[in-house]
Design a protein with these regions (language model features):
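A short, Lys/Arg-rich alpha-helix, primarily the initiator
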Residues: 1-17
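Residue-level signal for the short linker/turn that defines the boundary of a DNA-recognition helix
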Residues: 9, 19-20, 46-49
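Short, conserved catalytic or interaction motifs in soluble domains
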Residues: 41
Length: 68
């Protein structure tokens, strides 16, 4: 992860690499598309539970999503 890459940027990048639209990821994890948009815009931070669901839905590890 680039030093200036935020969680939201990383989330959006991985989601797009997986060719998953926002609405589909949001539906898979049980949140609104608007809420997912707020995560990708770095306006909100997901809870640990939602973070784990995002990792599972995208098929990535927590360290990969965090960029470590």
């Amino acid at each position: 992860m680039a030093m200036n890459e935020t969680f939201g940027v990383r989330l959006r990048k991985i989601r797009k690499q997986k060719k998953m639209p926002q609405w589909k990821l949001a539906k898979k994890i049980g949140i609104s598309q608007q809420q997912l948009c707020l995560y990708e815009a770095d306006k909100h931070v997901p809870s640990l539970t939602i973070f784990e669901w995002i990792c599972g839905a995208l098929g990535v590890s927590a360290t990969e999503l965090l960029g470590y």
